Structure formats: C-alpha cells, structure tokens
From Swiss-Prot:
It comes from Methanococcus maripaludis (strain C7 / ATCC BAA-1331). Signal peptide: none annotated. HAMAP family: MEMO1. Belongs to the MEMO1 family. NCBIfam families: AmmeMemoSam_B (TIGR04336), PRK00782.1 (NF001987). It comes from the Archaea. This is MEMO1 family protein MmarC7_0632. InterPro entries: MEMO1_fam (IPR002737). Pfam families: Memo. PANTHER family: PROTEIN MEMO1.
Amino acid sequence: MKRNPVVAGMFYPADYHELLEMIEYCYLSPRGPKELPSKRGNYTKPLGIVSPHAGYIYSGPVAAHGYKKISENVSGEVTAIILGPNHTGLGSGISTMKGIWKTPFGDMEIDNEFADKLWKECDVLDLDENSHLREHSIEVQLPFLKHLEELNIAKFKFVPICMMMQDYETSMDVGYFIAKVAKEMNRKIIIIASTDFSHYEPQESASKKDALVIKDILELNDEEIFTDVVTHNISMCGYGPVIAMVKAMKDLGATNSNLLYYSTSGDVTKDYSEVVGYASILVK
C-alpha cells in the first residue's frame, strides 16, 4: 500500500520548499549542529541513533544532530530500521508493514524483503498496516532521510516497526531479530529509535529524570533503561524502541555511545513549568 503522511502541515511543513527551508533551519539553528550535511560518508558498520519526534520547531534541531552523524557514516544503498512507539492504540502490539510511504520530498520505499523476513522470524512481530496509518513517531523521521537523499549522500529504504508493547523481554526480542536478519541478509543498516523523553514536567525534574535514562543509554545498559523508566516513573514514550535499538546494536558490535545534544521544549517556548525532553544520541 501507499501510506499518506498524517502530520505533514502540523509537525513539519507539507510543502516541498517550506520543508526544505525548515530542515535547513534545523541544521543551522543554535540548538542544531550549526552546519548542513556537506559530503557523503563511508559506511563501515551499523549505526544507531536516538531521535525525537515532536514538531520540528521544538525537536527538529535536536534531531538534526543525529542525522548529521548519519550523513557522515553512510554511502550507497542503506536500510533504515525505524522503531517508534504507538501513540494511537490502533493495530497490533508490535508491527511492521510493506509498501511505500509518501513524503513531501517524494516516496520512501520500505525494504519489503527485510520486513518480510523479519516478521516471519520474529514471533512477537505482526505484519499490520493499521498500526502505522495514524502514527507520527516514525513518519517524522522520514523527511530527514529524504533530505540526505536530496543531497546525494545515500539512497535509503526503511523498515517501520511500531511498538505498542514495550516490556523488556519483547523489546529485547525485537532487537535480537533485527540484528539477526541484518546479518543474514548482509544489509547495510542504520537503526533509529524514535522517542521523546519526559513529558509535561517542570524543567528541573524532567532534566534530572532524563539524565538517568541517558546515562543508561550511554552505558548501553538495556536492562537499566527499563528499570529506571519504571522505578522513577519517567514518561518517556519510546523506551521500548530504544531498548530494541541498543540490543540490536550491541549484537552488531557496537561498543560506545555519545550524547550529541539534549534540550527541552522550554528552550523554545521559554515556559519551563511543563516541558518535554528531547535527546539525540549516537550508538556505534
């Protein structure tokens, strides 16, 4: 099927030229990497990132840090595994799908071969379009990837994985099979875990809670990510996708992680009484 965007015109511009201007702003913003991706990288091994999924005016500059790193580490044809939480409650517990997703920059093809093999091997994963039709957490990552295509940095296909179930064991299973299938298919892959961090808390408490989980991610400690989210009641919407990404990346040989940037919505609105946390984190 062809999936139409559901948050174009809301989370990011629906017009090609306005979207291009917005993404360039995200890179050049004081909260962004302050430079545009300028040259094709050289793919040597899988790369993982944590990337936010709010409206671009709030989290786009933070996300740009991760996509700048992607641009420096990819070349040729690359499959992006994009894991996002299910905010809508529609569809199955964990799902992928096949087909094409439309974006203002043009169509984005799913790596149907990878998606098909993954859902057949991973018992917790379903092939289900309904989970994806209204969900924004994966969609908002695609314009950044298509922009890198516009710059001739790489050619991307992707595999969407929407996670309503985010318990520790299930998330670890998803990560295990992503790595297994990537090895079996000898794919060049990147893995994007789409999440925001604390939601609608004062800046001080949000940043303290977020620092706990960020520390766990930097230590590649998938079990502590889950433990801290539960123990400290951290309202991070995509902890399951992050756990799955960390598990997959470790199975693929990752040994280190770096915090690229952390910010909150308060840094944009200047209202620090209720903020949402955003982080860009590199795993390789």
